[in-house]
């Protein structure tokens, strides 16, 4: 097998490495640099990538930066002249450039690659990254999480004892914290948390905003509407940020930044590290949320962590290093360049794939829960967040109406209990279901997540064997804000969500109990005296009235009364008929209390679980 290169496709910069012998090595770009700016420019019909594109960004409006922030974002396109480009296409230009200079270095054609993504990337963002590789002419052998890759680079597989490692990854535009357990060559991710729209760019912007505000106060000129000035400010802010990692104060000088009535205006400012820390303190503190959540999800405390790794160029910021040291209670490991660790680790994984590296196993996790919408708008999870991948989970669902010919499977991703609050990944139909009473057809829904975190969903009618499948496409990806909002909302609205879920469950139970009781009464009509069924009928009428009045307290009370009356009737039927018919009668009303998902996570084939009423809508066969 030919060489498998490892690519860190970053927001601000990208890097590539390859395994030479048993050690990974960074491949330098044509300018001799070990990282390449993730910048693409269009000029006179030519596509420029990297250093040359970044250098002319000030004068060329057709320059695209930080495209990674838009990967998987539905409908997002960049317009250049009369042509539009998706984030995948722009990323592919960067990957093509990396592929070319890697081939020049290796002296052979490169076809295979391992590409890294932030641990908190969702399905759409991962799929978009894989598509970008495909567009660039690369066979993406594996998509792996950046923290896992950096752990590989630190050589932690060489440690004999089991270790729990916290990876704090703050890049140019994304941030996440992952907890890994390492030992005997196995790299198992225990949890991950983060924000796909927080990084060094945000720190740069704070400096830019400060410069703009000061300049406006001194000169009465607002630079925020001047595109050329903004690009110069961005470059100056990025340089100042880097300078302040090594010195306590830096001078920012931008001559001829604008013009006033008296002539040219120049920007001069001294920025101290203390002022920079003040401007960005809330950004640093914001990362503490993911830090705490990752530990909580892993069921660990900081005292359980054996080693802390800082990853991503933005972890060079002294305030970030100080904060992580305080939170973790130990000095982070600085032994590898944080800009290069991910690419080096990806190259090691490439060596695993090519067979050059043995005895290493990666066990990543899915960052968000996956499931479908069921009756009453409930989000029924099939795969919980932080589940080790690859994985597969099946569950049996059923129809919500008699003689329902088709079911609509609504696939969702998120953490909220109600489907309306989560993100739609896709929909598909399973048709030609034979006529049958509600609750009788058995529809097996299966979720498969592969080693790259890509989701496939299928629905199968167990009666006919007919099956429908879907691979979730990247156009349905979550935006940065949506991911952030999901978990924030889940925490803030936990009580509200619980109440709404309980209400929906009650309504579903009432519907099912009424349906089953009416069916039982119809079947026993003429077979037993009406005096025997009067209590059940009265209780049924009372429950239907409470349902019509939409009185939740009454519904709960009357549901319990009907359940008791139905059970009493079942006992009498059992005594009269020697057991057989009575047992069936008891199973009817009592079974009506079900309709909840099977929570047996130990089962992956869905067999033996209870049946769930799906949110499957009636389809008109004539349409």
Swiss-Prot record:
The name this protein goes by in its record: Chaperone protein DnaK
Protein task: Acts as a chaperone.
Species whose genome carries this gene: Lactobacillus gasseri (strain ATCC 33323 / DSM 20243 / BCRC 14619 / CIP 102991 / JCM 1131 / KCTC 3163 / NCIMB 11718 / NCTC 13722 / AM63)
Record keywords: ATP-binding, Chaperone, Nucleotide-binding, Phosphoprotein, Stress response
Superkingdom as given in the UniProt entry: Bacteria
InterPro entries: ATPase_NBD (IPR043129), Chaperone_DnaK (IPR012725), Heat_shock_70_CS (IPR018181), HSP70_C_sf (IPR029048), HSP70_peptide-bd_sf (IPR029047), Hsp_70_fam (IPR013126)
Induction: By stress conditions e.g. heat shock.
One term of GO molecular function: unfolded protein binding
Region of interest (Disordered), residue spans: 470-504, 578-623
Modified residues (Phosphothreonine): 174
């Amino acid at each position: 097998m030919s060489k498998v290169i490892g690519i860190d496709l970053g927001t601000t910069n990208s890097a590539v490495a390859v395994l030479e012998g048993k050690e990974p090595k960074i491949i330098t770009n044509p300018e001799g640099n070990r990282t390449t700016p993730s910048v693409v420019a269009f000029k006179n019909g030519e596509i420029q990538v990297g250093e040359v594109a970044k250098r002319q960004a000030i004068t060329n409006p057709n320059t695209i930066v930080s495209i990674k922030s838009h990967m998987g974002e539905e409908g997002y396109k960049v317009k250049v002249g009369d042509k539009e480009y998706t984030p995948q296409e722009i990323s592919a230009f960067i990957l093509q450039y990396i592929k070319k200079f890697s081939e020049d270095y290796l002296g052979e054609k490169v076809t295979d690659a391992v590409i890294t993504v932030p641990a908190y990337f969702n399905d759409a963002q991962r799929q978009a990254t894989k598509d970008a590789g495909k567009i660039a002419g690369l066979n993406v052998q594996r998509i792996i999480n950046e923290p896992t890759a950096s752990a590989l680079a630190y050589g932690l597989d060489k440690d004999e004892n089991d270790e729990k490692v916290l990876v704090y990854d703050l890049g140019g535009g994304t941030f996440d914290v992952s907890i890994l357990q390492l030992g005997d060559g196995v790299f198992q991710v225990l949890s991950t948390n983060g924000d796909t729209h927080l990084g060094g760019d945000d720190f740069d912007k704070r400096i830019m905003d400060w410069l703009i505000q000061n300049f406006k106060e001194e000169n009465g000129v607002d630079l925020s509407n001047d595109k050329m000035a903004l690009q110069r400010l961005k470059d100056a802010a990025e340089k100042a940020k880097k300078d302040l990692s090594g010195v306590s104060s830096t001078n920012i000088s931008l001559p001829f930044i604008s013009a006033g009535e008296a002539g040219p205006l120049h920007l001069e400012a001294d920025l101290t590290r203390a002022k920079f820390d003040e401007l960005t303190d809330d950004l640093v503190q914001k990362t503490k949320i993911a830090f705490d959540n990752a530990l909580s999800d892993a069921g660990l405390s900081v005292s359980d962590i054996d080693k802390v790794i800082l990853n991503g160029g933005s972890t060079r910021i002294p305030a970030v290093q100080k904060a992580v040291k305080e939170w973790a209670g130990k000095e982070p490991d600085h032994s590898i360049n944080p800009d290069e660790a991910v690419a080096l680790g990806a190259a090691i994984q490439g060596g695993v794939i090519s067979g050059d590296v043995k005895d290493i196993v990666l066990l990543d996790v899915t960052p968000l829960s996956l499931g479908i919408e069921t009756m009453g708008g409930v989000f029924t999870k099939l795969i919980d967040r932080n589940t080790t991948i690859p994985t597969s989970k099946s569950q049996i669902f059923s129809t919500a109406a008699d003689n329902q010919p088709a079911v609509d499977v609504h696939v969702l991703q998120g953490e909220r209990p109600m489907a309306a609050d989560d993100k739609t990944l896709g929909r598909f139909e399973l048709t030609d279901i034979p006529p049958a009473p509600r609750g009788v057809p058995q529809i097996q829904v299966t979720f498969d997540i592969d080693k790259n975190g890509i989701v496939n969903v299928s629905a199968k009618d167990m009666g006919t064997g007919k099956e429908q499948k879907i691979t979730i496409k990247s156009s349905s990806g979550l935006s940065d804000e949506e991911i952030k909002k999901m978990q924030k909302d889940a925490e803030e609205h936990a009580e509200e969500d619980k109440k709404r879920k309980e209400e929906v469950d009650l309504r579903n139970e009432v519907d099912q109990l009424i349906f089953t009781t009416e069916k039982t009464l119809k079947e026993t009509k003429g077979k037993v005296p009406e005096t025997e069924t009067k209590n059940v009928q009265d209780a049924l009428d009372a429950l239907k009235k409470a349902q019509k009045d939409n009185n939740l307290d009454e519904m709960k009370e009357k549901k319990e009364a009907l359940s008791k009356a139905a059970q009493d009737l079942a006992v009498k039927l059992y005594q009269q008929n020697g057991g057989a018919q009575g047992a069936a009668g008891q199973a009817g009303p009592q079974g009506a209390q079900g309709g909840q998902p099977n929570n047996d996570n130990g089962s992956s084939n869905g067999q033996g679980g209870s049946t769930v009423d799906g949110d499957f809508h009636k389809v008109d066969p004539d349409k």
